[in-house]
């Protein structure tokens, strides 16, 4: 029932924004409103009595199937089609059109709601089913969002309170501000459904298991003292007390076996539902944890980067202050040194200048000495060259003179030889001499000439030079000037 109501919740757009246009005094004073309030109170009292009777007699018929308590999110899968619970839910479930038409109507429409509830209760009494569907009447008065009283029809023995869209019956004593709070509360309730769903599933499953165990124990112990049910109707106790015999024992065993089988099936279904829900919860938790860890890691990285940037900025600012101070000190020192240099009072600068001047003087002195030595070497080379040229000139003159003298001497010797041959009688008589005599004479003459030449070889002027006339003083002076022995200034 809760699933149907939750799926077919009334949209906020259908609800009227200002449902109380009429004054409140007129609503309270109208007899129709009073009658509708009385009917609503009577229907609520009847439903509470039915719930109390169902809770006081938690027995199931042996011929009917036992239906396990169902979770509100899984009702449609567990309820059988032919079970009376499904019929009851189908009879009590309202469509979207009916739910949409409820708030549009005024207070007079509460009569229809109360009649529907009475019809449901009458059908339940006619079928005479026990523990098929328990009607739970709740009043959501804790929050300002729950306006009016809500009537829920559930399949479980224990009423399950959830923040779902229920059938609301508006009381005429409410104000316009309650509708605004209702809209806010519906949004809050829809957000809280997911968070409370897992905890309620666990609590309901544990509570139902405990109730099943207690009910099984009580049924096995008090089965002889309880009144059996047949065909969904209650029977009066017999005068003879509880039944005895083989038939009653068989029935007891059959009921116990059916109870255990239904309990085992319900437990299996519960375990399957719990495992599936736990797996889905674990997956969601893992995803959330992974995403949260990633977000936390990103946040930590961003925080660390921010801290690092702040630290770098502080370091840079401090470094700029220190740098400016150092540069200021350096500039002051440089200005002081400049003044000292201009005033020629800087000790280190003066010492450096003295060293530079000393080294400069040494280099100049060495350069001058080297230059003088180079000049002296050049002079010596020139003297050597000039003297060599003079000696070469003298040698060439002597060689030329000797060559000329040899030529002249040969010519003179030839002339004298011709003269001798002309005036020498032996030369004349050679023609009359025999060949032997002429050969001997020629041999003697050659030997004589050779002996003369050998004697003259030891004397200068060989061969014998001719007599030359005496040269004048000017000729001798010119010759000496050309030879370089005399200069023009010298006489």
UniProtKB/Swiss-Prot annotation:
Record-given protein name: Transcriptional regulatory protein dep1
Cross-referenced PANTHER family: BREAST CANCER METASTASIS-SUPPRESSOR 1 (PTHR21964)
Organism lineage string: Eukaryota, Fungi, Dikarya, Ascomycota, Taphrinomycotina
UniProt keyword terms in alphabetical order: Chromatin regulator, Nucleus, Phosphoprotein, Repressor, Transcription, Transcription regulation
Organism, as annotated: Schizosaccharomyces pombe (strain 972 / ATCC 24843) (Fission yeast)
Cellular compartments annotated: Nucleus
Function recorded in the entry: Component of the RPD3C(L) histone deacetylase complex (HDAC) responsible for the deacetylation of lysine residues on the N-terminal part of the core histones (H2A, H2B, H3 and H4). Histone deacetylation gives a tag for epigenetic repression and plays an important role in transcriptional regulation, cell cycle progression and developmental events.
Subunit comment: Component of the RPD3C(L) complex.
GO biological process: negative regulation of transcription by RNA polymerase II; transcription initiation-coupled chromatin remodeling
């Amino acid at each position: 029932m809760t699933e149907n109501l939750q799926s077919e919740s009334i949209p906020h757009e259908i609800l009227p924004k200002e449902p109380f246009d009429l004054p409140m005094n007129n609503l309270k004073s109208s007899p129709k409103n009073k009658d509708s309030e009385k009917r609503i109170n009577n229907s609520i009292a009847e439903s509470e009595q039915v719930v109390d009777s169902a809770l006081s007699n938690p027995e199931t018929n042996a011929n009917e199937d036992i239906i396990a308590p169902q979770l509100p999110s899984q009702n449609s899968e567990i309820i059988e089609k032919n079970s009376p619970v499904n019929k009851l839910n189908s009879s009590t479930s309202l469509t979207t059109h009916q739910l949409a038409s409820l708030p549009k109507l005024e207070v007079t429409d509460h009569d229809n709601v109360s009649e529907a509830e009475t019809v449901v209760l009458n059908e339940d009494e006619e079928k005479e089913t026990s523990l098929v569907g328990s009607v739970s009447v709740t009043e959501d008065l804790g929050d300002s969002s729950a306006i009016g009283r809500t009537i829920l029809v559930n399949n479980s023995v224990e009423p399950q309170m959830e923040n779902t869209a229920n059938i609301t019956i508006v009381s005429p004593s409410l104000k316009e501000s309650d509708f605004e709070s209702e809209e806010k509360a519906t949004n809050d309730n829809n957000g809280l459904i997911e968070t409370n769903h897992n905890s309620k599933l666990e609590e309901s499953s544990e509570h139902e298991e405990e109730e099943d165990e207690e009910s099984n124990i009580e049924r096995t112990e008090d089965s002889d003292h309880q009144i059996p049910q047949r065909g969904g109707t209650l029977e009066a106790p017999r005068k003879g007390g509880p039944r005895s015999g083989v038939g009653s024992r068989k029935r007891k065993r059959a009921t116990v076996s059916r109870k255990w089988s239904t309990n085992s099936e319900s437990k299996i279904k519960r375990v399957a539902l719990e495992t599936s829900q736990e797996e889905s919860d674990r997956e969601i938790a893992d995803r959330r944890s992974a995403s949260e860890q990633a977000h936390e890691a990103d946040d930590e990285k961003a925080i660390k980067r921010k801290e690092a940037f702040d630290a770098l900025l502080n370091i840079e600012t401090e470094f700029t202050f220190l740098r400016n101070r150092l540069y200021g000190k350096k500039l002051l020192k440089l200005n002081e040194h400049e003044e000292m240099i201009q005033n020629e009072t800087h000790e280190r600068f003066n010492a450096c200048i003295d060293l530079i001047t000393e080294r400069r003087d040494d280099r100049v002195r060495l350069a001058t000495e080297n230059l003088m030595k180079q000049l002296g070497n050049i002079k010596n080379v020139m003297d050597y060259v000039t003297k060599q040229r003079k000696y070469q000139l003298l040698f060439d003159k002597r060689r030329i003179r000797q060559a000329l003298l040899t030529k002249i001497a040969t010519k003179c010797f030839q002339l004298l030889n011709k003269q001798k041959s002309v005036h020498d009688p032996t030369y004349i008589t050679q023609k009359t001499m025999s060949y032997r005599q002429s050969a001997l004479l020629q041999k003697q003459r050659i030997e004589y000439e050779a002996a003369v030449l050998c004697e003259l070889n030891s004397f200068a002027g060989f061969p014998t030079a001719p007599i030359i006339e005496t040269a004048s003083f000017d000729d001798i002076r010119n010759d000496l000037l050309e030879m370089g022995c005399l200069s023009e200034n010298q006489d």
